[in-house]
């Protein structure tokens, strides 16, 4: 668990808001029940609710709302409904990004995805971490680790990607895998825990 923060100034409300946000996205321990974070969570949930209620044929409106929600996306970003995330602004996706139904991202830390990536249905990306000690866990103190995915990656259906993982470029992750550690470039990886089973031949 990251070191605790004891230097917050209780007399500065706006400073506390900025500080708890910076603590969260930078991997330091933070208070998950801080009012500022809860306010941002609920605002994002309202926007996600709006997105998921749009008709599938309303492609322009869907894309416009995604570009408002996400930290970075493009006119060719496509995410099937329903889609779920915590903050949205910590998610950055590259060109020609596609995600299928029930894509879930807990983006307490940055989630960065490269170009030409395909996400299968029921894929989950987690950045939030909790203590295994029940007393510490019940304090609602958390920390987060970023997830990074390279270019030309295919994530199969029902894959779970855990906090702090980096997946290289030109990678296929087999359906149902649980990715608990980094995956190198140019390979096929499957299983729980996810392991490399084949490297692609270099031309």
What is the predicted function of each stretch?
Residues 167-182:
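C-terminal/domain-terminus segments
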Residues 83-93, 98-166, 192-203:
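Flexible, glycine/small-residue-enriched loop-and-beta-strand segment within the central core
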Residues 165, 186-187:
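Extracytoplasmic/periplasmic beta-strand context in beta-sandwich domains
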Residues 154, 172, 188-190:
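Short-chain dehydrogenase/reductase
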Residues 180-186, 202-203:
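Gly/Pro- and small hydrophobic-enriched strand-loop and loop-to-helix capping segments
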């Amino acid at each position: 668990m990251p070191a605790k923060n004891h230097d917050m100034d209780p007399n500065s409300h706006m400073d506390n808001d900025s500080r708890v946000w910076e603590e969260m996205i930078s991997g330091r321990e933070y208070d998950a029940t801080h009012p500022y974070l809860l306010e941002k969570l609920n605002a994002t949930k309202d926007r996600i609710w709006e997105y998921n209620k749009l008709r599938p044929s309303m492609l322009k409106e869907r894309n416009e709302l995604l570009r408002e929600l996400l930290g970075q996306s493009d006119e060719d970003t496509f995410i099937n409904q329903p889609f779920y995330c915590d903050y949205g602004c910590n998610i950055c996706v590259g060109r020609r990004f596609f995600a299928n139904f029930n894509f879930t991202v807990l983006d307490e830390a940055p989630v960065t995805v490269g170009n030409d990536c395909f996400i299968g249905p029921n894929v989950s990306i987690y950045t939030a971490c909790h203590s295994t000690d029940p007393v510490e866990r019940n304090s609602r103190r958390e920390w987060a680790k970023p997830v990074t995915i390279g270019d030309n990656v295919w994530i199969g259906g029902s894959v779970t990607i855990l906090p702090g993982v980096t997946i290289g470029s030109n990678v296929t992750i087999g359906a149902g895998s649980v990715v608990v550690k980094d995956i190198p470039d140019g390979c096929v990886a499957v299983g729980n825990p996810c392991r490399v089973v084949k490297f692609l031949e270099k031309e």
